[in-house]
Design a protein with these regions (language model features):
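Beta-rich interaction/scaffold domains
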Residues: 2-81
Length: 81
């Protein structure tokens, strides 16, 4: 199934992916959710990895660079809180 989105909608999705990348990176680095328990941190990372996996697989991307998203997916998959 092909998703038909406007250029603006695609840009919004890409921006949201960047937010997930930033959050995964920050949780792993210990600069986000430092006061939360391990289960909450793990849940956050897992949810954001799942979001990135779903979004990277979309067929509406054209020239967007997925390097950071793929790196965050890999880092998040290896993360254990």
């Amino acid at each position: 199934m092909t998703d038909t989105l406007t250029t603006e909608e695609i840009a919004q999705h890409y921006t949201a992916m960047g937010h997930s990348v930033d959050l995964i990176t920050a949780v792993i680095a210990g600069t986000a959710m430092a006061e939360d328990d391990a289960a909450d941190k793990q849940d956050c990372v897992d949810r954001n990895v799942e979001h990135l996996e779903l979004m990277v697989a979309k067929d509406f991307w054209t020239t967007e660079d997925m390097t950071a998203a793929n790196a965050a997916i890999t880092a998040g998959q290896g993360y254990t809180a």
